[in-house]
Amino acid sequence: LLDVTGTIFIAFFFWTIATFRSFITQFMMRRQIKKQFGTYVSPDLVKKLQKDPSLLRLGGETKRMTFLFSDIRGFTPISEKYQNDPQKLVEIVNRFLTNQTEIIMKHGGTIDKYMGDCIMAFWNAPLDIEEQERKATVAALEMREALGELNEIFKNEGIPEIHTGCGINSGLCVVGNMGSSNRFDYSVLGDAVNLAARLESSCKTYSTDLIISEYSMVDGYDYQFLDEVTVKGKSEPVKIYTITK
């Protein structure tokens, strides 16, 4: 009989090495996912991504998504009051952002970025989200309600009220890791994103705190027609609506 002990040992050795390398690769992938998405999506989504990293397509893909922009309106009185106390001003902004962000994440949204006191969020990436338009709408309405509660707290603390404008739009865009070889972020590009930002900035013009495009409308809400707006590069105007309080 041939002595196969050496062969078995060698096979076991290489199997151990392969298993260890696979473990390290998976560990690094999970750590990278937590680092990249841990503060931008809900903990449940992070766990799902860590469990199955193949769900991610970080290289870039085209898909229908829903976008939400929210920004503080009339920030000047607050900034003027605390111009000599920048730490207090930052604290107020952070309390506002936390108040609003928790609601977005609760409804499956991803925080793309903060731009000062502005929040940009989207639905349907990095994971597919069912009823993305409805979840964005529910989030916006809950954000409105939560801000009212936060303003009551601010009032008791002598802090001026915060008012916001919010824009929601849905459409095709490109999503994935974007940036230079030294720094990149998971973000989006497309006309649908730009329109959502434009709707948010138009809230003051239409004296409302929420504008939703016709592409994001869902059943079950009492929409009030506002206007038709022409989007750069498009021949057909887009109908825009609000949902009254």
Label each residue range with its predicted role.
Residues 56-138, 186:
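Catalytic NTP-binding/metal-coordinating core of nucleotidyl cyclase/transferase enzymes
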